[in-house]
UniProtKB/Swiss-Prot annotation:
One of its GO terms (biological process) is extracellular matrix organization. Residues 33-82, 376-424, 436-493, 522-584, 607-667, 703-762, 763-825, 1528-1591, 1649-1709 form the TSP type-1 domain. Glycosylated. O-fucosylated by POFUT2 on a serine or a threonine residue found within the consensus sequence C1-X(2)-(S/T)-C2-G of the TSP type-1 repeat domains where C1 and C2 are the first and second cysteine residue of the repeat, respectively. Fucosylated repeats can then be further glycosylated by the addition of a beta-1,3-glucose residue by the glucosyltransferase, B3GALTL. Fucosylation mediates the efficient secretion of ADAMTS family members. Disulfide bonds are present. Keywords: Disulfide bond, Extracellular matrix, Glycoprotein, Immunoglobulin domain, Repeat, Secreted, Signal. Residues 1709-1745 form the PLAC domain. The gene is Adamtsl1. Residues 966-991, 1114-1137 are annotated as: Disordered. Glycans are attached at residues 251, 310, 391, 451. Pfam families: ADAMTS_CR_3, ADAMTS_spacer1, ADAMTSL1, I-set, Ig_3, PLAC, TSP1_ADAMTS, TSP_1. Monomer. InterPro entries: ADAMTS/ADAMTS-like (IPR013273), ADAMTS_ADAMTS-like (IPR050439), ADAMTS_CR_3 (IPR045371), ADAMTS_spacer1 (IPR010294), ADAMTSL1_dom (IPR056272), Ig-like_dom (IPR007110), Ig-like_dom_sf (IPR036179), Ig-like_fold (IPR013783). This is ADAMTS-like protein 1. Disulfide bonds join 45-76, 49-81, 60-66, 534-578, 538-583, 549-567, 775-819, 779-824, 790-807, 874-922, 1177-1225, 1283-1336, 1401-1452.
Length: 1745
């Protein structure tokens, strides 16, 4: 066919219009897309193998933003990398090996399969647990997960299908085929049960062939699995599976788990060899093995290439076929191999056109190929349909369909079906006559023929066909009856009529006619027409009818009349009698069946016989109510005897008569069914009989495979039209009730749907928010906005924009938010001052009296009464107040009826209720401040917060938001005196930071911390408010006036109390806390009075005296509390207690004071004017403790300038710089000691308390040291390094590790972390990665000081888990020497004498342990006569030239600072030697030849071994000893048997038997046979021999010479060869196998093989020139003599000559218009000249046409 044609006139205009329209459309699309430029070229692939990524870019040509992305990706380099290339992620990690991390080089290994961020480069330092993210993104093309093709692109994990395409979800099927349907493999599953015997300890479980996948075996029982393999090259292997692990067996990965009660074997596959799973018997019990795997179908159909074209030019066709291919051997095999698998469907042939070029201009023609263009293609041809198998109701008819081919002469021949498979095969079966068969249709019943008593009624029954017409063809057997009896309940009072009144016309006539009608069928039958009218109007007359012989023609559904002799069977009557009613009132009896009309005799019978009731039947139920039926009998009225029922008139039979019976209730039974037609269920115990079984087995056979759908999953959407899925599995229900899951191809029925739509209703309207805009400023503080549209998702899944009033109100903060960029630099002012700042107030508020409204500033804590309105302000600087946001317990707060969030930076809570308690957070950009609100109940107790308002997640959130230092301090306080032991308070860092001051406030409220009169007035507060007119104490009223509405204290004051309490001994905390709380209450109240100018004079105070400090300081109150009066006296009566130093908080020190007095725990700063320093130290204890002072760890040297006062205080006069340091007060008695330090600094310079000692720890779980020394400790302990600093102002402490600054809390490595708390550094669970130099730097305005501690981690000597290194060292030291590894339990090595041996001492530890060798407990150097060498840093001991005997025990002792480890091994020198045992048994019991031969044994350590081991050892000389030298008793002597008398068929052989006696001298003499007969039975002297049959080969005569021809006149002839006896009895051929077998075939001369190939002359060439000329000739096999054609197979012994060849292969010179084929006239007749390919071949003829 031509690929293009010339356009018709007018086409250019159409094309131009189309191009213009296309350009407009394209331009509008470009406008919508934002005018993108064309995509650029693809970049280089990110990888050269293993699957990488390449990208392409485009740019936006519009000034507006363009829709869509400017980058696209595709996969590339999807070829496997060579094995030596390594993992791509590992290459990226190793690139960081030469980059120091925290000052140290590591070898980095990849960390794969991170579920949180698989596309970040996380690596682990080799040999440690340190995991670090070295880069936020891996290189493009890196696999997201090790077992997935998904790849990381630009830091995001992109889905990649098995077709290596981005975004593709195509996956491999169970057979490993990408996007396969699972048809190339089959599921194999089964169970094996061991039946091993004593003689057979191994058995084969299953053979799993090459290429199988997803193998899983589970063994349950005592036996053991092992593997045997065989590769395709024939190499065999075995794996014993001795331990759990992952092995590589013949390049297949095997995952084996050995559990106590079972073994599990998994192999993902595909297997690279045949695996034979075997079982080894290890126990008495049987084992079972369940296995499942997918086995590849190794024989599959493979489509062939196209066969040669049917024509060489001018257009032909060609087809493909399919061949069966063996995947293992890579060769084509017979088709039956592929037919074995039902999953294999042979592909249908494909047809395509070929050689479409026109043939050369010549008169040649292509006729050598088997197909030709000028005759039709092979086609399907069908025979006519057969007759329908059924005339109605649906039948089938069939026909034959074959593939035929028509040659150029028009001859049609059948060919192979595959030649026609390019078109669908016509159906061979079709349904026919699918209309319904005729059916009986009954009309309604007529009225009863009588008005009283018993009568008859009739109905019309019609045969109706599928068209609704009355016709024949219905079965007479299924016809409903047309007559039945009827009873009128009205009694008859007139004489009984002899016969019931029959139906009047037309009922009787019509029913009788229809009843006698016959159906027309496909067989000729007599069909009667309707009866004529009766010949008389009364009395008896006659009726006649016409009888026709008819047949039903099925193809036309019409009826044809036939001659009467065509119908078989009796012809129905054509005349009968009729009765038209009585004449003149007579009532004669009439029998319609009596055609003669003779009625005599009936009257007599009627008079003699009649029906009567005779009793009732047995009751149908024994209880509970049943029924009885009356028995109707035919009786002789004269004799009253039973008569035959035929003698009574049937129409007179009385109606059925029933009555009830046995109405008494039944006893209790399981089911009761009686009068009420109900079922009453009773208790099972009330039934006497055994209860029948309610369950029985049925249908105990496997069900056919069927689809089993699971429950529908949840809808993918809650509204707007979603999808829900379910699993639909093909399963087979087994006979035992279990289910077997099968591949889907096993279920023939159509698969139920696994997807369906759901939630097809509209969604509620909701806001759709855009992305946040860019910040409104380029630096500093700005805002971001975003737009919102109200949309609704309809039930169709389409989103539509709706009116914004339909969406809920949108909070202001949802559309605008603050943003902070880098601070804007301004000349002369630090940029940090421009960040937002919240002016917080760090106060504690306690409400004591009811107030309507209270105002607070964020930053503090408030303990308030319910129903109080609270206004909370958030004063900010450098921040716009409308942008302030509020949170409560981490949740964003919005305005409501109860809480108002004002746009001016404050929050208002109306009338507090318990749910309002919590943590309120004000956010101004990055600045955040909190305010905690707690509620006070009516009993002055804090109201517990509702559980639902505080979850563990919120707790964790608040702790993270709180300063970790404060959290640690909170933890410390809660573990102190105020902790009540609850779980929440013992959780340490996770405790609620809002509970920090609850205990102090509770004490203030409950434990009388207020002045006494004040408390009394407080307690009557509520009653005073409830009843203002009640008579109360006027003093209390006055005190109530003095009580503040809300008491205020600074948080710092409460923090000092908590810190002070935490430093007190436990036994003093309760007492101390009472003092501190009481002092706090007095200070708060006094501060309030001072502020109000209401402080009464001392004489007017009704409160206890309070200590007033020298200056006014509301929240920094302090007081020197002395011991209580109880402690002042009565020392002997007090219980014994260890010393405790009272820790007190002094007033703030003034640097200008000339005399400084302070308590312990403070810092003293020496100024130029300081003349004296007095350090107080108060201690309690029983016995009274003694006090001594040290400075910087050394005892204080007292002098005239440094004095010890009588109260144990230390006074320093005229202090100088040498006096600077930490002074420690030590209190000691017999029960223990206590010490507290105080720092004295120079002009406030920082001071660090140091210790220069080295601490070694190998056992304790915790180590605490002061900074300045060295700590050597084992792993896993918690190390605390105290850095106690002093300075005024307070020095800031900074920690460094290896000169790198440490944060407040940080994970050093996996499992270890550090925490900073009040100047101390806590290292938890230290390991080698924690080693280093830790430095503490104290700095303030006056200077800085740095001290360091070196931390060294020790590892005690231990046996390493991996022994490959020392084994390699042993192999390198002595490749051929026997070696043994020492162990703590001891090992043993057995050696030959003179051998050398290597002993390895596997050890690891830090620092490297020192190894010492011993023999028998003595140092190896002092061992006598032992040649030894120590190599490998002491780990290898070589001992040489070991002599015989045990060498004793060798041991190696490894020791370092962390501990020691002793390992042992024993060397045993073995030797073989000969041993002479007792004499062996005498060789004879009598005669002169008996000797005792001494027995030699080869021994090894007293154990007998193979004598070969003693070869070369000197044998002991042994001499035989004579024994049993005496006369023997008489015995029979026999000679050898003679030769058999016959070689087959049974012969005889003989021997000589004599009785002889052997003397002690060795001479044997004959004696009488009787002497031997007394001792033993005489042996036989004759026996049969050669009993086997005599056989020979026999053969028949040669058959005719008619076998296959093998040459000219040469054929093959045969004869039979069989085995038989000499008697002619035929035997199996095996009986004659020992004899040479005669030949059964030979060559012979045959006239039939006198044949040869005969060829005709070549035809004319199809072309005179060119490359397409062919000629053919006839080739046939003919007989030489007759010259007639014979079958070609007779000539097959010779090569068949060619029947076609090319010709006239020369270039054509002229191109004139002429015909090149002789069929051009037919081309013109068929009007094919309009086709180009014919027009060119028949140029001349078509030109004339």
């Amino acid at each position: 066919m031509e690929c293009c044609r010339r356009a018709a006139p007018g086409t250019p205009l159409l094309v131009l219009a189309f191009l213009l329209l296309s350009s407009r459309t394209a331009r509008s699309e470009e406008d919508r897309e934002g005018l993108w430029d064309a995509w650029g070229p693809w970049s280089e692939c990110s990888r050269t193998c293993g699957g990488g990524a390449s990208y392409s870019l485009r740019r936006c040509l519009s000034s507006k933003s363009c829709e869509g992305r400017n980058i696209r990706y595709r996969t590339c380099s999807n070829v496997d990398c060579p094995p030596e290339a390594g993992d791509f992620r590992a290459q990226q990690c190793s690139a960081h090996n030469d980059v120091k991390y925290h000052g140290q080089l590591y070898e980095w290994l990849p960390v794969s399969n991170d579920p949180d961020n698989p596309c970040s480069l996380k690596c682990q330092a080799k040999g440690t647990s340190l995991v670090v993210e070295l880069a936020p993104k891996v290189l493009d093309g890196t696999r997201c997960y090790t077992e997935s093709l998904d790849m990381c692109i630009s830091g995001l994990c992109q889905i990649v299908g098995c077709d290596h395409q981005l975004g593709s979800t195509v996956k491999e099927d169970n057979c490993g085929v990408c996007n396969g349907d699972g048809s190339t493999c089959r599921l194999v599953r089964g169970q094996y049960k061991s039946q091993l015997s004593a003689s057979k300890s191994d058995d084969t479980v299953v053979a799993i062939p090459y290429g199988s996948r997803h193998i899983r075996l589970v063994l349950k029982g005592p036996d053991h699995l092992y593997l045997e393999t065989k590769t395709l090259q024939g190499t065999k292997g075995e794996n014993s599976l001795s331990s759990t692990g992952i092995f590589l067996v013949d390049n297949s990965t095997v995952d084996f788990q050995k559990l106590p009660d079972k073994e599990i074997l998994r192999m993902t596959g595909p297997l690279t060899a045949d695996f034979i799973i075997k079982i080894h018997d290890l126990g008495p019990a049987d084992s079972t093995v369940q296995f499942i795997f997918y086995q590849p179908i190794i024989h599959r159909w493979r489509e062939t290439d196209f066969f040669p074209c049917s024509a060489t030019c001018g257009g032909g066709y060609q087809l493909t076929s399919a061949e069966c291919y063996d995947l293992r051997s890579n060769r084509v095999v017979a088709d039956q191999y592929c037919h074995y698998y039902p999953e294999n469907v042979k592909p249908k042939p494909k047809l395509q056109e070929c050689n479409l070029d026109p043939c050369p201009a010549s008169d040649g023609y292509k006729q050598i190929m088997p197909y030709d263009l000028y005759h039709p293609l092979p086609r399907w041809e069908a025979t006519p349909w057969t007759a329908c198998s059924s005339s109605c109701g649906g039948g089938i008819q069939s026909r034959a369909v074959s593939c035929v081919e028509e040659d150029i002469q028009g001859h049609v021949t059948s060919v192979e079906e595959w030649k026609c498979m390019y078109t669908p095969k016509m159906p061979v079966v079709q349904p026919c006559n699918i209309f319904d068969c005729p059916k009986w249709l009954a009309q309604e019943w007529s009225p009863c023929t009588v008005t009283c008593g018993q009568g008859l009624r009739y109905r019309v029954v019609l045969c109706i066909d599928h068209r609704g017409m009355h016709t024949g063809g219905c079965s007479a057997k299924t016809k409903p009856h047309i007559k039945e009896e009827c009873i009128i309940p009205t009694p008859c009072y007139k004489p009984r009529e002899k016969l019931p009144i029959e139906a009047k016309l037309p009922w009787f006539k019509q029913a009788q006619e229809l009843e006698e009608g016959a159906a027309v069928s496909e067989e000729p039958s007599f069909i009667p027409e309707a009866w004529s009218a009766c010949t008389v109007t009364c009395g008896v007359g006659t009726q006649v009818r016409i009888i026709r012989c008819q047949v039903l023609l099925p193809f036309s559904q019409s009826v044809a009349d036939l001659p009467a002799d065509e119908c078989e069977g009796p012809k129905p009557a054509s005349q009968r009698a009729c009765y038209a009613g009585p004449c003149n009132g007579e009532t004669p009896e009439f029998n319609p069946d009596n055609g003669d009309g003779l009625l005599g005799g009936l009257q007599d019978l009627d008079e003699l016989y009649d029906w009567e009731y005779e009793g009732f039947t047995k009751c149908s139920e024994s209880c509970g109510g049943g029924v009885q039926e009356a028995v109707v009998s035919c009786l002789n009225k004269q004799t009253r005897e039973l008569a035959d029922e035929n003698l009574c008139v049937t129409s007179r039979r009385p109606p059925q008569l029933l009555k009830s019976c046995n109405l008494d209730p039944c006893p209790a039974s399981h089911l009761l069914s009686r009068e009420m037609n109900e079922v009453v269920v009773l208790a099972d115990e009330l039934c006497h009989h055994p209860k029948p079984s309610t369950v029985q087995a049925c249908n105990r056979f496997n069900c056919p495979p069927a689809w089993y759908p699971a429950q529908w999953q949840l809808c993918s959407r809650t509204c707007g039209g979603g999808i829900q899925k379910r699993d639909v599995l093909c399963k087979q229900r087994m006979a035992d009730g279990s289910f077997l899951e099968l591949p889907e191809t096993f279920c023939s029925a159509s698969k139920p749907t696994s997807h369906q739509g759901c939630k097809k209703d509209d969604c509620p309207s909701e806001w759709l928010l855009s992305e946040w805009s860019e910040c409104s400023v380029s630096c500093g503080e700005g805002t971001q906005t975003r737009s919102a549209i109200c949309q609704r998702v309809l039930k169709t899944g389409v989103s539509t924009v709706v009116n914004s009033t339909l969406c809920p109100p949108l909070p202001f903060s949802s559309s605008i938010r603050p943003c902070m960029l880098a601070t804007c630099a301004r000349p002369g002012r630090p940029s940090t001052k421009h960040s937002p700042h919240i002016a917080a107030a760090r106060n504690i508020y306690i409400q004591t009296r009811r107030q309507r409204k209270l105002h607070f500033v964020v930053g503090g804590f408030a303990y308030l009464l319910p129903k109080t309105t609270v206004v909370l302000r958030c004063p900010t600087r450098r921040f716009r107040k409308p942008l302030i946001t509020w949170e409560k317990d981490g949740q964003h707060s919005i305005s409501s009826a109860h809480v108002t969030v004002a746009p001016f930076g404050y929050l208002k809570i109306h009338r507090l209720k318990p749910s309002d308690a919590g943590i309120y957070t004000c956010s101004a950009g990055p600045a955040r401040e909190q305010f905690v609100i707690k509620l006070i109940g009516g009993n002055r107790k804090l109201v517990a917060r509702p559980l639902s308002l505080w979850s563990e997640e919120e707790e964790a959130l608040q702790v993270r938001k709180t300063n970790p230092k404060e959290a640690l301090q909170t933890h410390k306080h809660q573990n102190g005196i105020f902790s009540n032991g609850s779980k929440a308070e013992k959780r340490g860092l996770t405790a609620d930071p809002g509970n920090r001051y609850d205990d102090i406030v509770s004490r203030l409220l409950e434990q009388g911390g207020w002045p006494g009169e004040l408390l009394a007035s407080w307690e009557v507060q509520d009653s005073a408010e409830r009843n203002a007119s009640s008579e109360e104490d006027p003093n209390a009223e006055q005190a109530l006036l003095h009580l503040p509405f809300t008491m205020v204290a600074e948080q710092k004051r409460l923090d000092d109390i908590l810190r002070n309490l935490s430093q007190q001994p436990e036994e003093l905390r309760d007492l101390y806390s009472k003092h501190l709380v009481a002092q706090l209450a007095q200070d708060i109240f006094r501060s309030h009075l001072e502020n109000q100018d209401l402080l009464p004079k001392p004489s007017e105070q009704r409160f206890p005296p309070m200590a007033v400090p020298a200056h006014k300081h509301v929240s920094g109150f302090s007081s020197s509390l002395r011991s209580s009066s109880g402690e002042a006296g009565g020392g002997s009566r007090r219980p014994h207690r260890k010393p405790a130093i009272l820790r007190k908080i002094s007033a703030a020190q003034q640097l200008s004071a000339s005399e400084v007095v302070t308590h312990l725990g403070q810092t003293v700063a020496l100024a130029s004017g300081t003349l004296s320093v007095l350090l107080h130290c108060e201690a309690v204890g029983n016995p009274r403790p003694t006090i001594h002072w040290t400075r910087n760890g050394e005892a204080v040297q007292f002098s005239d300038r440094i004095l010890l006062q009588p109260d144990d205080s230390l006074q320093i006069l005229a202090p100088v710089e040498a006096d600077v340091g930490f002074y420690t007060c030590n209190a000691t008695n017999a029960l223990g000691y206590d010490s507290v330090s105080i720092a004295v600094t120079l002009a406030g310079k920082p001071l660090v308390k140091t210790s220069r000692m080295t601490v070694l720890n190998t056992e304790k779980p915790t180590v605490t040291v002061d900074i300045g020394g060295t700590v050597r400790t084992v792993r896993g302990v918690n190390v605390t390094i105290n850095c106690q600093v002093a300075g005024v102002p307070e020095a800031e402490v900074t920690w460094f590790r290896n000169k790198s600054k440490l944060g407040s809390s940080h994970h050093l490595h996996e499992g270890s972390s550090h925490h900073l708390h009040e100047g101390s550094l806590l290292l938890t669970d230290v390991s080698f990665s924690d080693q280093g130099l830790y430095s503490c730097r104290a700095a303030n305005l006056h200077g800085e000081q740095t001290e360091s501690t070196q931390l060294l981690i020790l590892d005690p000597p231990q046996v390493p888990t991996q022994l490959e290194d020392i084994r390699a060292l042993l192999l390198a030291t002595g490749p051929n020497l026997p070696s043994v590894l020492m162990s703590p339990l001891g090992t043993q090595l057995v050696l030959d004498p003179g051998n050398s041996a290597l002993l390895g001492c596997p050890i690891k530890g830090h620092p490297t342990p020192n190894i010492t060798w011993f023999q028998n407990g003595q140092p190896i150097a002092t061992a006598p006569g032992l040649t030894h060498h120590i190599w490998g840093a002491g780990q290898i001991l070589r001992v040489a030239n070991l002599s015989g005997g045990p060498q004793g025990e060798f041991s190696c002792l490894a020791q370092n600072e962390a501990g020691t480890l002793l390992q042992k091994a024993s060397l045993v020198i073995q030797d073989y030697w000969w041993s002479v045992d007792r004499l062996a048994t005498c060789s004879a019991s009598c005669g002169n030849r008996g000797i005792h031969q001494p027995r030699l044994r080869c021994l090894l350590n007293t154990t007998e071994v193979d004598p070969e081991h003693c070869t070369g050892k000197p044998r002991p000389a042994v001499q035989p000893v004579a024994c049993n030298r005496r006369d023997c008793p008489s015995r029979w002597m026999v000679t050898s048997w003679s030769a058999c008398t016959r070689s087959c068929g049974g012969g005889v052989q003989t021997r000589r038997v004599t009785c002889q006696k052997l003397k002690a001298s060795g001479i044997s003499t004959p004696v009488s046979n009787d002497m031997c007969s007394q001792l033993a039975k005489r042996p036989v002297d004759t026996q049969a021999c050669n009993q086997q049959l005599c056989v020979e080969w026999a053969f028949s005569s040669w058959g005719q010479c008619n076998g296959p021809c093998i040459g000219p006149r040469l054929a093959v002839q045969h004869r039979q060869v069989f085995c038989q006896t000499r008697d002619g009895i035929t035997l199996p051929s095996e009986q004659c196998s020992a004899l040479p077998r005669p030949v059964s075939t030979q060559n012979c001369w045959s006239e039939a093989c006198s044949v040869h190939w005969r060829v005709s002359l070549w035809t004319l060439c199809t072309a005179t020139c060119g490359n397409y000329g062919f000629q053919s000739r006839r080739v046939e096999c003919v007989h030489v003599r007759t010259n007639k054609a014979v079958p070609e197979h007779l000539c097959s012994w010779g090569p068949r000559p060619a029947n076609w060849q090319r010709c006239n292969v020369t270039p054509c010179e002229n191109t004139e218009c002429r015909d090149t084929t002789r069929y051009c006239e037919k081309v013109r007749q068929l009007k094919l000249c309009q086709l180009g390919q014919f027009r060119s071949r028949c140029c001349g003829t078509c030109g004339k046409a």
